[in-house]
From Swiss-Prot:
Cofactor: Co(2+); Zn(2+); NAD(+)
Protein known as: 3-dehydroquinate synthase
InterPro entries, per the entry: Dehydroquinate_synthase, DHQ_synth_AroB, DHQ_synth_fam, DHQS/DOIS_N, DHQS_C
Lineage of the species this protein comes from: Bacteria, Bacillati, Cyanobacteriota, Cyanophyceae, Oscillatoriophycideae
Function as written in the Swiss-Prot or TrEMBL entry: Catalyzes the conversion of 3-deoxy-D-arabino-heptulosonate 7-phosphate (DAHP) to dehydroquinate (DHQ).
Keyword match Metal-binding: yes
Chain sites annotated for binding Zn(2+): E186, H251, H268
GO term, biological process aspect, one: aromatic amino acid family biosynthetic process
Xref: CDD domains: DHQS
Localisation: Cytoplasm
Origin species: Gloeothece citriformis (strain PCC 7424) (Cyanothece sp. (strain PCC 7424))
Length: 367
């Protein structure tokens, strides 16, 4: 059964369609959008081996002409060089302004495909078909696209909304367990910043750290509620003028830790998990919420099999320095998203370097 969530924007509204087995109906879903017949499917080799044939057959059955472009897996390939290679394939296949790029993969594939679509011929349509939990509930929704710069994550990018986000939860069965757990960090984030009922549902679940632990109904509920939270926020603040910044809860310190560990020792969701622990601890110190609520959050993060400590090999001063290149810096001040209670957060630039330093030392692994 489909769950359909509208993302209502002043222009370029679209739908998130969620259903088991929906990948085989990709072509039929796209046929309703009045798109040109030429499409470029962008994926990575592993995902394409699993799901490329299903997607391509569905598109061809619906009358689309399909070209493909595969990019290596990993955050280290999220660069302008990789974007140029997508452009090369677009040239070779005569992609026009009426053509569409399709992202079949995780957040890296989605970010890069969206950025290529945003900039090819000054902007063509694209469709998100996320295959990781993290991409399904976060990266694929909201139109943020881009690549990394050697000095920081996602510093080069554009807002470019997809025409459709198609989510098939069953593709998660081939997702590596570590990647599934990384996605759960973003689910927990929505519970803390927006949806206290989702948080309670996660607390009530017996286990959260593996795909096989969740029955189909619970998985569909988690994905749907998370997507609804993201859609609600994006609909109210498309270009991150204010409210949308709350979606970066846990990301401020998390991004710094990711980049300092080469995007591999600590991957995105793990960085967010550590960042949420840090933000929750800062919020206790600033008396924004209680230690009891911070403990509930941290217990849920542990239940999802996620790290809660800064790795011992990461230099705290280097994290503080990395915060200065964060996208949320305004007038030289780092803006933090801090919880006030489960389901509600606030944005502040009043967190001093001394407090950050103290909290990071407190939550750094001593091993």
């Amino acid at each position: 059964m489909y769950s359909r969530i509208p993302v209502n924007l002043p222009q370029n509204s679209y739908e998130i369609a969620i259903a088991s087995g929906s990948l085989s109906r990709l072509g039929a879903e796209m046929s309703t959008l009045n798109l040109g017949k030429k499409v470029l499917l962008v994926s990575n080799p592993e995902i394409y081996d699993y799901y490329g044939e299903i997607a391509v057959n569905s598109l061809k059955t619906a009358g689309f002409e399909v070209a493909t472009h595969l990019i290596p897996e990993g955050e280290i390939y999220k660069t302008l060089d990789s974007i140029t290679q997508i452009y090369d394939t677009a040239v070779e296949n005569f992609l026009e302004r009426s053509s569409t790029m399709i992202a079949l993969g995780g957040g890296v594939v989605g970010d890069m495909t969206g950025f290529a679509a945003a900039t090819w011929l000054r902007g063509i349509s694209f469709v998100q078909v996320p295959t990781s939990l993290l991409a399904m509930i976060d990266a694929a929704i909201g139109g943020k696209t881009g690549v990394n710069h050697p000095k920081g994550k996602n510093l080069i990018g554009a807002f470019h909304q997809p025409r459709l986000v198609l989510i098939d939860p069953q593709v998660l069965k081939t997702l590596p367990p570590r990647e599934f757990r990384a996605g759960m960090a973003e689910v927990i984030k929505y519970g803390v910043i927006w949806d206290a009922n989702l948080f309670s549902q996660l607390e009530a679940a017996k286990k959260l750290d593996e795909f096989s632990d969740l029955d189909e109904d619970l998985l569909q509920t988690i994905i749907t509620r998370s997507c609804q939270a993201k859609a609600d926020v994006v609909s109210k603040d498309e270009k991150e003028a204010g409210l949308r910044a709350i979606l970066n809860y846990g990301h401020t310190i998390g991004h710094g830790i990711e980049s300092l560990t080469g995007y591999s020792q600590i991957i995105h969701g793990e960085g967010v998990a550590i960042g949420m622990v840090a933000a929750g601890t800062i919020a206790v110190k600033l008396q924004l919420w209680s230690e009891q609520e911070a403990n509930r959050q941290d217990a849920l993060i542990k239940k999802a099999g996620l790290p809660t400590e800064v790795p011992p090999n990461v230099n705290i001063e280097a994290i503080i320095e990395a915060l200065q290149t964060d996208k949320k810096v305004k007038a030289g001040k780092v803006r933090f998203i801090l919880p006030q209670q489960i389901g509600t957060v606030t944005i502040t630039d009043q967190v001093t370097s001394d407090v950050i330093r103290e909290v990071l030392a407190q939550i750094q692994s001593k091993a």
